[in-house]
Amino acid sequence: TMDKDGKKVSGKIHSVETLGAADGPGLRFVLFLQGCTLRCKYCHNPDTWAACNAERTATAEDIANEIIRYKNYFGKKGGVTVSGGEPLLQLDFLTELFKILKQNGIHTAIDTSGAPYNEYDPRYKELLALTDLVILDIKHIDDLKCRELTGTGNIATKKFAKTLSDNGVAMWIRQVLVPGLTDDENDLKRTREWINTLKTVERVEVLPYHTLGKPKYEQLGLSYPLGDTPIPTREQIDKAKAILIG
């Protein structure tokens, strides 16, 4: 696609992981886009926040060519996952990339918070027709607690999930488990009830909070939002899994 000046749309790229096993089915080529409007307290990639700080910009065509070189490695079982940052902030680039990937028979996934979703933006229809899987990060089921945790409420995320469900788009739901913030039993039960209203959820994952991102905050001269918050115990993780998945 061309933008209004007739230039090819470029994506703001943070990094790539050529063979990742954690973001979708099989082996994945994971493309991390630059830029995010959320400020999740547990974010471990604060270096992806500022949209102007992209490591590089590249056209969808260039990135697709890079990906296609790895096609033999990820084969039929794997594919491509676009993560971030927040991929939905770069809709035109994402759609253009997925068009080329689908022409090449490659499985497409988006790892997103759903926060930028706007039901009145017609571009989503086109994107979702090219999307095989959405890995949806539900930050918090409670709108106010979500706002407190991320700076943004969860209404758009819930609307996005319903749109995916209504349009037959497969999704995985992810909940990051942070002691004292996202592990309240009643909240988790509400999350489970909400998941049960969605028709296309193939998998629910509980991601235990970790502190691997701490050094990045120091490098960026930022204070670490969660201070000394402990990582969850095995028991806390199992309890959350029992409610959300069991």
Language model: regions and residue ranges:
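Auxiliary Fe-S-binding modules of radical SAM enzymes
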Residues: T1-A22, P179-G246
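Short hydrophobic interaction/assembly module
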Residues: A50-N72
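Flexible, glycine- and charge-enriched loops at secondary-structure boundaries
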Residues: N53-A60, T150, N154, D184, ...
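Conserved AdoMet/S-adenosylmethionine-binding subsite of the radical SAM
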Residues: A64, I68-N72, K76-G79, G84, ...
